Amino acid sequence: MNSKIKVDKFVIVAFLLCMVCTMAMQAKAYDNFKVSVYVRAYEVDKMKDIHWLDSTWNVISQQLEVDKIYLETHRDLLIVDDATLEQAKKFFHDRGIETAGGITYTINEANSFETFCYSNPEHREMVRKIAEHTAKHFDEFILDDFFFTSCKSDIEIKAKGAQSWTEYRLKLMTEAGRDLVLKPAKKVNPRVKVIIKYPNWYDHFQGLGFNLEEGPQLFDGVWTGTETRDPAGNQHLQNYLSYNIIRYFDNRRPGYNGGGWVDSGGLKLGMDRYAEQLHLTMLAKAPEIILFAYNQLLGVKLSPRFRTPWQGMGTSFNYDEMTAPIRQKDGTSIEPTTMARIADVVLKQTDKLIGKLVNPIGIKSYKPFHVAGDDFLQNYLGMIGLPMDIRPVFPKDQQVV
């Protein structure tokens, strides 16, 4: 009897220790949202070398607390093999990090963002196989915002017929999403959740086939590109878009907008331009932020050139404080080396504020599907201090629209 009691006690103690370890591994780094990192297929492919994976992850994780990793399976015709994907998944799971998949449907991004031709039978077969390959490894994956087509091959010209390019591409990409991505993926893995990321060009979605009328209802969720980068760049995006476009997709299909997405674009304006994009994304109450990408968080080194002239004048972004030594949990300190440190400090600042805020409100602004003209008007209104709230359906219950 005594031996049985001892065994039972041992089992209980072991169980409790496992529970404590699990809770510790699953402890949230942030109270009000998740922070995730997207890894391009180029870097995922390098993760076949476990030493490279471990050493690079140490650089990032010592500076930035991460809840989730998106492992891309395809980009520019590079398909990451099964063994590498499983090794990478296990590596992150062992460290308490969630994993999901990602796909970028490009043939050659460097060649003017060359995409697939979705009426070409060979291309269609590749698109289908990539979706199946990804669904085999993940219960969730996201399509990076290259799920569009700019192809004008002979096949596409013939298939278009008398339609305009916009009409043709809207129908084509809706069909491709349904028949080449969703159906094949769910046949391989009925549990899989497929999310489409929409880019930051909301006034021009329709021209290359992003169908805002049907797409958000077709996919299991949407993601929002909140990258505003340099306002003087070729897109001429105003800073307010990082907030405004989150609200637009929240209103398009409430409860299905997974979050925002920011990269390192615009750093020539200073590191606080990056910080502002993070702040504005989260102030829109995004439930998750994806930081693009692993290679940038690893490779963009902290430098005095990112310190703007107005530092030291009482601004909320203090470059010197953010680049000070980081105290680790074991009491040691390390010198921050990359932009991962900036993301960590900024997001933790924002996290403290977000919990005190209610849901955003603003002046309702009606934007019908597939319209052109008055490019990004709502962003300009936001920049002069008017709180905007874009709606895809006319808000009949409002006195002011």
Each model region followed by its residue ranges:
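Bacterial Sec-dependent signal peptides at the C-terminal "C-region" and cleavage site
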Residues: 21-31
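Bacterial N-terminal signal peptides
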Residues: 11-22
